[in-house]
Amino acid sequence: MLFRSDPEGRPTVFDALPADMPRVVSIGRLDFNTEGLLLLTNDGALARHLELPATGWLRRYRVRAHGRVSQSDLDALPEGVTIEGVRYGGIEAAIDSVQAGNMWLTIGLREGKNREVRRILGSLALEVNRLIRVSYGPFQLMDLAPGTVEAVKRRVLADQLGPAAEQFGLTGPIDGYKARQAKLNPGARKGGDEE
């Protein structure tokens, strides 16, 4: 769960983070019944920037769904779809395999509206029973174990952001980056070089 604390007392993602980690926010969200890659940052402006569809970063999911649909049904999704008055942008979708009453699909989208994958596939009479985010832009889940935290190096993030990296203090000397981080997290521990 992505709340700092859950009203029902369930554990949250933030409960599992290392104690010495600075306060972070999620980039996007994962619904309660969704698993997989979650990016965290201590820079709220960076989080907002990366969540915007204009950034162009594709979020890719592996989906197990009950029901049947043809690839030709999925081939209409790149044009977008309107469900119950809500417009969803273009979606890439491919059937990976069919097993008993379930199908495995790979879905790619650039928006990230609440329950978007479940609603779109539901409109095709598919009931999602497992949803795993496998990538967010250039960052991939690959073999990262559940609950594992892995830092993204400053240089890697700057390369991925391209020209936008400058507005987040990622292109100048490391001292400028550290000053920006200290301003964002005044109580954070001082530590190693994030190069």
Predicted regions and their residues:
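Basic, flexible Lys/Arg- and Gly-enriched helix-loop patches that mediate nucleic-acid binding at interfaces
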Residues: 1-195
